[in-house]
């Protein structure tokens, strides 16, 4: 009786390392060699001995029963049968025992010579083609030239050359082949993986490393330098693995065989078998290996052997990675077999299918229905479902109460649903919440805990206020129920996940459980006032009196009445008289007293604000009760009010016909202008679109006005829209105004959707004509198709965001940084997009904030800016506040609480362990689906905004201009602006506070001067919204250069007018560029303008021009449908840090513009700084220039049209600018959709994109040039060599060598020793630290380059990540969330924070007793022990 070894893996490991497996390790983990390709005997269904399923190697098929049946039952456990050699043990060992195959010849591992970068190739310095030739037995490679003439190491020989060489050497040096391999004279050349093995054995990593470093530092050729750096990275990874990895292990002599239960073979009926692909692949390897063994034994000729060896190499290749090969092994029905690599990769692979997403027990799913009578924290659970979910708990109670004796009989009782179990179930469910989840779970509110109530039926009941968070409706949605089992899980569900605790949305801190639809409608209806109804103007002593009057029918629910009510003012309770209505009194019965008296019409917005203030003032529990109360009131009143609508409620305004007539007249006028040749074709199109947009807008306004006055504002359709219950202005406009302009179907490849210039004049009430209907269908279908496509995109975006940020956890209270972000309010022209209050609320200030007028300290440095303080700052003249931000946080791991600020879901400062990274990713990803789904309903209506053409002052104030150049126009009072970057500010005359900022477009007419006072409503500037123009800055005669017909311009005669005009085209002759010059009487050139492509030249050669006259018009392409395409793709483009398709060329320095020569269709532009520095840029002629000669530009100004690339911003303006740019640009996309997301979420993601730096000069550190590393790693490495010395000349020292880095102390000791012996001392220089430049990575790159290889491998490119990690011998310290989920550990965040593991909770007395015992144990009689403070908690 022999016993076998047991090696169990502990589950409490804290780090995991991946390395190459050595042959010894594979053998150590193996339980025996697989010798035969047989699997199981098809008659007895028993595994064949020594085959792929052999019981002797892998363990018994049945629990505690050996193959031959000699030993059965558990009492023989651990015995190895003497007849069949099978160990008697449980059958689950077949899931963990490995076998192995001994290969007759070594085989190269496909991962290391087929994937890029080619590891074996880089180590040996061989290109992939040559490597393949050696491995697949086509060429011999010289391993040691020995005495052979004209050959060096790594030369390739064909078979003839090899044999000739052998003969030649045999002639010249007899017996050379009989020498030992170690003899340097012996000529050795080999073929196949064996040759590679020998070469790898001979590799000396250190010397290669020195040689390559030298080459990288000294080589002039950029290409050779890059090549050296690439090889160096592979060499350094082997060196970094500290001897754990040997290069020759990339060639395998032994192959592991994975346990049989992981590659099962299942008999189907009809005598056939379903098998895992791996079995086929293993069989091919074994068959070929055995055949090769036999061929070698019978001494077959070399040709046959070589063919068999090549086939073995290919068989092993396809076992490890079948998808890499061009000729993948196919199964019977022509599908490639799934190899080991394929079983890790992709959505169905091991990582994503089994390790990150497991199916769980104790779960159920069913359809949901509404449960209006539930409380906020409850849900209705069908009886049958509950009985099944809580089964073990019921069984336990049944046995405890003595109703049954055994578990089996208890089970039967539960399955039969005997009445006795229901009250036990009720008892068990108390205080045992369930988790409800609705797929897709886009943010953390997609899973919430509820206290279940037993209900009849088979559907789950859901509280109507939780719907928003789950994004659920009751049209057949299904939800899953999960049961938390352990006490810890139950506690967390109750304290953290209960629905009544999740009232605020983590994305923006606004309440998410806001009444919607019926509830809003009911509340709106009873709080709306209706004058001249029964009881209007009555005065009551108190709410009770008013309610009695209403119940007696003396006063109408909407009648405006006066009542004495209790109200809060500055925290004081006061009684005062308000004008209100009975309906509002009803609502106020439920509003907590501290909030005060709510006296307004309750729409959705108002309700959200009230709920927000209830949470702030009264806390969560009160809010939950308040929500339930107003929910009941809302439903009841919607039912009492009978608020449905009929066809007559959809009013069509009488002015419609007249407005449409006006539209037609205006369009006719435009057509006339066009046929007279006053305007171009594009202008005509733009103006027509504009006209109809205006008409539509006016019609909407008339319509809303009429609806709101219909029936005293109690028109049902209007009430639904106004309260925010259902429908929008857009939709009502289509019901009873006109459908308006529609987008044209897009030809594939054509530019964005044009707009059809004939609008749909009918509305849905009148009905559409056939043509109108047909035009509409396109939009409707496009909407649906877009939705389907973009949902997938949004999901993928969320996944990438989570992957890049999952390890951002709050790890400490304060990182102690002194840096911050300067925050101001965000304006677009005039409108405040985000106020200072919003942007600083809940953040931490870097410095003391002092009130500029009173000198009081509003907020101290390092304190949270609360609502009150933020309001004071907003009202004061302070324009910018420096706040702490994750972007500037200096924590090594994760971020600190101070830099993050307030947790938006709780309205308190964030706690340690909060997973802010995942919350940020979810907050950004969740509305992503809305960004895409917004093409809904309003089928493709061109939401075109009517363009404005002038700027009216909205304030009284003083004008200030920055960088203004303007010219006076003869005979006119206005000036024309000729500078590009002009800013106009309106300042308050008394305080000097800036009221408004505007950018002035080039070519605008300016009616005021610097320092003028303007009144509200004054027109300051006016411009042409449809054309960009070029304006003459001087008076003179016009002369054109390079304006040649059909080369640089073409005459286009208008189809309708026959008038001709010059349009500049892309020059066919690349040396010519069109210019307009202005010359004075003497023929001297005054000004030179370059003419961009597509410009319409208004003047002719030789015309006299006045100052400020328009020379050229460049039609702007207005009239593109504002579709969503900006939406998701733009967000992706920004987060991936991609360069836009036509990037702008940006000036890198401040300076003056000069035009240079033309080169190959590019115009050369120089920027010369005041210090004489000059930069040259080549700009394609097809691009429009945004600058003219002699303009002064600042660094970062675009010189040509197009979007600015983030990389340019980083290079020119630095990291802070690029971070702000990305955050603001992404915010713009979301704002356009009306989605509010707090800045800090974007900052977390951008922080992750900016973690890495690129080494510019490695100095004396371990880094390589161009290597991408973590910021903190560079700092650590620089600290390590700080103050150390590099040996230049070792002198007579025995210990030190040149190039070695030593500490000053060691050097001092060594030199003093040498001095004593009068020997030559060591010469040194200071060690140089590395310099690095910040880089910006897209989220995919950043996610693939995280420290954790497990996280990266489970994200994308699994095999590449794993094989690079294996070579470096990488260690994963399990710091992020994904790695821990994969290992089956608690995540190191929230309640799983590693610091909490060691906490012991005990009673105070026990604590004191324990410490006293410890003291007496430790105390030494002489010294008095120091007193230990007991914690105060």
Swiss-Prot record:
Annotated Zn(2+) 2 binding sites: 815, 889, 896, 899
Catalytic activity entry: RNA(n) + a ribonucleoside 5'-triphosphate = RNA(n+1) + diphosphate
GO molecular function: DNA binding; DNA-directed RNA polymerase activity; magnesium ion binding; zinc ion binding
GO cellular component, as recorded: DNA-directed RNA polymerase complex
Keyword Magnesium: yes
A Pfam family annotated for this UniProt entry: RNA_pol_Rpb1_2
Protein residues bound to Zn(2+) 1: 66, 68, 81, 84
Cofactor: Mg(2+); Zn(2+)
Gene3D superfamilies: 1.10.132.30, 1.10.150.390, 1.10.1790.20, 1.10.40.90, 2.40.40.20, 2.40.50.100, RNA polymerase II, clamp domain, RNA polymerase Rpb1, domain 3
Entry keyword annotation includes Transferase: yes
EC number(s) reported in the record: 2.7.7.6
UniProt xrefs under InterPro entries: DNA-dir_RpoC_beta_prime, DNA-dir_RpoC_beta_prime_bact, RNA_pol_asu, RNA_pol_N, RNA_pol_Rpb1_1, RNA_pol_Rpb1_3, RNA_pol_Rpb1_3_sf, RNA_pol_Rpb1_4
Binding annotation for Mg(2+): 473, 475, 477
Quaternary data: The RNAP catalytic core consists of 2 alpha, 1 beta, 1 beta' and 1 omega subunit. When a sigma factor is associated with the core the holoenzyme is formed, which can initiate transcription.
Family under the similarity heading: Belongs to the RNA polymerase beta' chain family.
Family matches, as HAMAP family: RNApol_bact_RpoC
UniProt name for this protein: DNA-directed RNA polymerase subunit beta'
Protein species of origin: Porphyromonas gingivalis (strain ATCC BAA-308 / W83)
